[in-house]
Every structure is written in structure tokens, then in C-alpha cells.
Curated annotation (Swiss-Prot):
Belongs to the UPF0434 family. It holds the Pfam family Trm112p. InterPro entries: Trm112-like. This is UPF0434 protein VV2354. One of its GO terms (cellular component) is cytosol.
Length: 59
């Protein structure tokens, strides 16, 4: 994931900052506890595609 891209993308729900989870290939919104998938190198920033994170994830 290009770090320059992380500087400009935002969570589509809260407009907050996203972090990259290299292991799971997801962009994480810690505020909303949502994980957006990255498919074939392209972030899928659609709320219906996001996965709700468990309480123990993303800490």
C-alpha cells in the first residue's frame, strides 16, 4: 500500500483517518471499527463492503 495514498483517503462513514493492516490487506477505521478490503491492490471504500471489527481487533 502506497503511504501517499493513506494520506489522502478517509473513512467514507466518519471521514476519519485510515490505517493499513498489511497482514489482512485491509484499511482500518479505528473510530468506526470498520475494516475495508483491498482487492487486487485497490481499496474498496464502500460501507456495505466493510467488515465490522471485534472488540479485540485493531488495538
Amino acid at each position: 500500500m502506497d503511504h501517499r495514498l493513506l494520506e489522502i483517503v478517509a473513512c467514507p462513514v466518519c471521514k476519519g483517518k485510515l490505517t493499513f493492516d498489511k497482514e489482512n490487506q485491509e484499511l482500518i477505521c479505528k473510530l468506526d471499527r470498520l475494516a475495508y478490503p483491498i482487492k487486487e491492490g485497490i481499496p474498496v471504500l464502500l460501507e456495505p463492503e466493510a467488515r465490522s471489527m471485534g472488540m479485540d481487533e485493531g488495538r
